[in-house]
Design a protein with these regions (language model features):
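Hydrophobic, glycine/alanine-rich multi-pass transmembrane helices and their short helix-loop junctions
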Residues: 34, 283, 372-415, 419-425, ...
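Short helical (or helix-break) motifs at transmembrane helix termini and adjacent helical loops
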Residues: 330-351, 371, 377-380, 408-415, ...
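Feature of extramembrane
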Residues: 1-292, 426-768, 772, 921-923
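C-terminal transmembrane helical bundles of large multi-pass transporters
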Residues: 706-709, 714-927
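Membrane-water interface of transmembrane alpha-helices in multipass transporters/channels
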Residues: 42-47, 290-299, 314-331, 385-401, ...
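Interfacial segments of transmembrane alpha-helices in multi-pass membrane proteins
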Residues: 14, 216, 259, 263-318, ...
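Hydrophobic alpha-helical transmembrane segments in multi-pass membrane proteins
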Residues: 19-27, 272-280, 301, 305, ...
Length: 927
């Protein structure tokens, strides 16, 4: 920053403090309007661009889900769900569910009060499932053949019904409802030899009308739109009705409320986030020994949130977990850093017996350059995320840059200005806060304002913006305006008394923190720079070796409390389904699908899936999930009623001479598929076994001959990302072979396992691209402003060390790269460069005063070094508390951020001083 420009800014800040603070206040009030009225309703997408997402979008568009499935796992405490007690109780709860639905009482969230449950004709079993896709209706149909109902049936009769279902090839698919631990033994029942099946658990799904719920495909993950949230409210409502209070069975939802669970855990983590802010503010107050510093910083952080949300709304940034929670939490550290450096420097100058206004002038003169550079480099670090292909990351970088600018204005400039005005009032009022009574008042007031402002912040960020703003306003009035009004009143009393009593000497804070210890650490380091830098280089080399081993991994337990029903339900699913089921993936196929040879190629591809280790084969022998074009073709050729209807409708006779389930000619196949899309498929006695809506979820017939189908399959163990990668690699050769068929135009892989893999890969790529961009941009900016490439490089180099150390620790502690941990890299650059800039700028300032680098570094350590320790302590203690939050995502973020800030402090106090004395522009180049 040029000296003339800097001088003008300093004079403006110190001369027009009142108008400047007034403008900031008016701007804050103005931002309240967009904060409420222009708040985004859309969430930033966590998905990058790419084929896997394009295919998923086309699949969702071409194959609209008519039914929303809510999956559950029911487990018997007695080890067998195939008993009268469990099944009759389950049926009773289902009947209660039906009754509530008819009355519109299942509606939850913002859903309209109307019936939602639907029936489903299972094409594999040929049985109509009434609202619940479960083993209950198949068992009930067999019991009716015997002449009893579930309520009347004995254990033997139920076991007989299960045996008949499983032993019949047409209904053996009921095995897929049972636990992988299900077993059987031969027994005689009513003179019939049967297999007596015992299953500790069963899976089932409740079916609702997806169109009434807003449509859309299956979405499991944080960041859902309002329709997804409403579905989750409905899922929870259904579970409440089906839970059995008498203990006949235990019920687990299977990922039925990902967003609501995240919201609940986020709210339960709110107290820890609030404690983080409280501790940060109290440490600031302790470090500066000032109630006013605590109050100004606490209220300043609250105003910072208004600026962040208001400006974000003005420029159209979307919301999301990261923008709404992670960015505000991160800004606690950066905001505290701006405040402590500005306020600490002001107190240093004031302790030199300057008047408050002169002290402010000296402080701003000394620290403004560093604050501006910190603001610019922080912004560059965060804006480097604009290189990402992920919308949520781009909006994160933009929001963080806004917050950095707001921190600079509010806590770096306005905070010391306001403290100066308070000190002027205190001097004019002859007010001195000495004695035990004043000390107790300061401590009580500091705790009160810390708690109140933290409450306002957490309310604005996570609960209610309106209540948060009101709370912040009340906090400002109670803890800032009223004390200032008291000083004004006292000043008027003093003026009326015309008192000319001399003021006592100003109290000098000689030990705000352990200054000798900080000086000792820094000076001992700079006396042996080569040794220190050599050790740092060795540690960094080892760290890089381990850091590059970090892999992108997703596991639900990294995001949700391990004791939550979300995690327990998935654990139960793994336990009872194992390798016979898993997360669905899909192969997208587009081509001339009315060519029988194309269907034969698809059929061969489906059979080849059995040879891939990571693809599940159900207990009934199916390797695909749901319908595809080959299934529809086989249902048509197996149905004489459908064949007759097609011939009557179109004049085309369906034949299948080789009995492969595929019509012999192109004309036959096209006629069959088009009939099925319009009318469905008929079974025995002309009863419909496939509805048109079901067909439309298996085949999309295009007027231009490019038809589409999806081949769904299941992948067990996708919580281990290496399984997804291995599956993708294993299936690729088969995909290439299928696409090589002349009638197949495009083949691709999609589904949630592969979209998540792409998300993780893009998050990692963002780290790899944004990090060098931020570092290079920081070096260029600092070189231009400092007019020294050496100083700029020395300032930025410790940040590289911090990132390497941090990710090596992550690897050692068992963390993995994901959306949240990847962002910590960007935050570490922002905080690390902050610390480095303040040390470098202060050292250069002191070097101009004294020629000896040791003395210059000693002054730097006693001034800026102390401020760095205060800033770091406030953040480390606060974020360490967040590390105890029940939600693992917040806990990991808090712990790793605390570690990162500590590493940044060490790098700034130990490594950076050694670099500075090596490159110092002084006659005595080395100590």
């Amino acid at each position: 920053m040029g000296d003339s420009c800097k001088t003008i800014l300093v004079l403006a800040i110190t001369k027009w403090t009142g108008p400047i603070m007034g403008i900031v206040l008016l701007f804050t009030l103005f931002l309240i309007y967009p904060m409420f009225r222009m708040a985004p309703s859309m969430q930033a997408s966590p998905n990058p661009s790419g084929e896997v997402f394009e295919l998923q979008e086309e699949i969702n568009d071409k194959f609209p889900n008519s039914i929303h499935f809510t999956p559950f796992l029911m487990e018997s405490p007695n080890g067998d769900v195939l008993t009268p007690g469990v099944l009759s109780r389950f049926k009773q709860h289902l009947e209660n569910l039906f009754e509530m639905d008819l009355n519109g009482d299942l509606a939850a969230g913002s859903l309209e009060n109307q019936p939602y449950l639907v029936n489903y004709l299972d094409p594999d079993l040929g049985i109509l499932m009434q609202a619940a896709h479960s083993i209950l209706d198949p068992i009930n149909s067999k019991l009716l053949d015997i002449g009893v109902t579930i309520e009347e049936a004995s254990t033997e009769e139920i076991k007989l019904a299960v045996h008949r279902l499983i032993s019949n090839p047409q209904t053996t698919g009921v095995l897929d409802f049972l636990s992988r631990h299900a077993s059987y033994e031969p027994k005689d029942v009513n003179g019939e030899k049967i297999l007596w099946w015992v299953s500790p658990a069963t899976t089932f799904s409740i079916m609702t009308d997806n169109q009434k719920l807003g449509g859309g495909g299956l979405e499991i993950g944080v960041g859902g739109e309002p329709d997804v949230i409403n579905k989750e409210h409905l899922n929870r409502r259904i579970k409440e009705v089906l839970i059995d209070d008498e203990g006949h069975y235990d019920l687990w939802g299977i990922a039925i409320d990902a967003n609501l669970e995240a919201q609940d855990e986020g709210e339960s983590s709110g107290v820890y986030i609030m404690a983080t802010v409280i501790c940060a503010l109290l440490v600031i107050g302790f470090a500066l020994k000032s109630y006013w510093a605590t109050a100004i910083c606490g209220i300043g952080l609250g105003i910072l949130m208004i600026w962040l949300k208001g400006i974000s709304a003005l420029i159209g940034l979307k919301s999301g977990l990261v923008i709404d929670l992670i960015v505000p939490i991160s800004m606690i550290s950066l905001g505290a850093d701006f405040a402590i450096h500005a306020l600490r420097r002001y107190k240093e100058e004031k302790n030199n017996q300057y008047t408050p206004r002169i002290a402010l002038t000296a402080a701003i003169t000394g620290v403004l350059g560093a604050l501006v550079l910190a603001m610019l480099t922080d912004s560059i670090a965060f804006l480097s995320n604009l290189s990402s292909s992920i919308e949520a990351v781009i909006h994160f970088g933009s929001a963080a840059a806004i917050a950095v600018f707001a921190s600079f204005i509010i806590l770096g400039i306005i905070a010391p200005m306001l403290l100066m005005k308070v000190d002027e009032l205190a001097d004019a009022a002859r007010f001195r806060s000495t004695g035990k009574a004043h000390l107790a008042t300061r401590i009580t007031g500091s705790i009160g304002v810390a708690v109140a402002s933290s409450t306002a912040i957490i309310l604005m960020v996570a609960v209610s913006k309106l209540v948060g703003v009101i709370t912040l306003g009340a906090t400002t009035i109670l803890f800032l305006c009223l004390p200032i009004a008291y000083l004004v009143a006292k000043q008027r009393i003093v003026e009326k008394s015309n008192s000319h009593q001399l003021l006592p000497d100003r109290c000098i804070d000689t030990n705000l923190l352990t200054i000798p210890a900080i000086e000792f650490l820094v000076i001992r380091s700079v006396r042996h720079p080569i040794l220190v830098l050599g050790i740092a280089a060795l540690i960094t080399s080892i760290s890089i070796f381990f850091a590059v081993k970090l892999e992108p991994v997703f596991d639900v337990k990294d995001f949700y409390d391990s004791e939550s029903e979300m995690v327990i339900g998935l654990n139960q699913l793994d336990e009872h389904v194992g390798k016979s089921g898993g997360e669905p993936g899909v192969v997208y196929v587009r081509g001339d699908l009315v060519d029988p040879n194309a269907l034969k190629a698809i059929s061969n591809f489906i059979e080849s899936l059995r040879n891939i280790d990571h693809i599940a084969e159900t207990r009934s022998g199916r390797v695909t999930a749901g319908l595809n074009v080959v299934d529809v073709s086989r249902f048509i050729t197996d149905s004489p009623f459908t064949i007759a209807s097609i011939e009557s409708n179109s004049g085309v006779q369906i034949t299948d001479s080789d009995l492969d389930g595929i019509p012999d000619t192109r004309q036959q196949l096209e006629a069959g598929l088009r009939f099925a899309v319009e009318h469905g498929v008929l079974g025995a006695a002309g009863l419909q076994i496939l509805m048109p809506d079901q067909i439309k979820q298996a085949i999309y017939l295009s007027e231009i001959g490019e038809h589409v189908t999806g081949i769904w399959f299941q992948i067990p163990g996708t919580r281990d990302q290496s399984v997804v990668t291995a599956t993708e690699q294993s299936i690729k050769p088969a995909l290439i072979d299928l696409e090589a068929h002349p009638s197949i135009y495009r083949v691709g892989l999609s589904g949630s396992p592969f979209t998540r893999k792409a998300q993780l890969s893009a998050s990692t790529q963002t780290l790899y691209t944004s990090l060098p961009i931020a570092l290079v941009a920081a070096v260029v900016l600092l070189s231009a402003t400092m007019r020294s490439v050496r100083y700029a490089t020395a300032t930025v180099l410790p940040i590289v060390l911090v990132v390497a150390w941090l990710y090596a620790i992550m690897y050692a502690w068992g963390f993995a790269l994901n959306f949240v941990t990847a962002m910590i890299g960007a935050i570490s650059i922002g905080i690390g460069v902050d610390y480095s800039i303040h040390m470098t700028q202060r050292f250069r300032e002191e070097s101009r005063r004294v020629s000896d680098v040791i003395e210059a570094m000693k002054s730097t350590a006693s001034g800026t070094g102390v401020a760095l320790v205060g800033s770091a302590a406030s953040s480390v203690i606060g974020f360490a508390i967040l590390g105890f939050a029940p939600m693992p995502m917040f806990a990991a973020y808090g712990l790793l951020t605390a570690v990162m800030i500590f590493l940044a402090l060490i790098a700034s106090l130990v490594v950076l001083p050694c670099l500075l004395v090596v490159v110092a522009d002084t006659p005595e180049r080395r100590p």
